[in-house]
């Protein structure tokens, strides 16, 4: 994965904890984001298609969502670029994941 895709993967992995601890809250948060974002994007744009796909995933349940959050499959990578989970992690959690990711990337990609 490219750096930004790997960073997104790490952030989405961090969502597994909240998702498994309180799935109703996390899925409701994602649904609220989707509703809000639908009005902010062109009705005929690609973002609407991604949001519709996320809605279907949310309707499929926690297991389907968790699978996409951690998958390296190209389609999952693309889905995460339009993730409805903004705001689930608080700023301290996000920053901690970013710091951990930077250390990981520097260590594992030092020769690249």
Task: Please give the residue ranges for each predicted region.
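Amphipathic protein-protein interaction modules
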Residues: 45-93
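The feature represents the first ordered module of a protein
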Residues: 1-57
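Low-complexity, compositionally biased segments
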Residues: 15, 25, 81, 111-112
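Long, highly charged low-complexity segments enriched in Glu/Asp and Lys/Arg with interspersed Ser/Thr
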Residues: 92-112
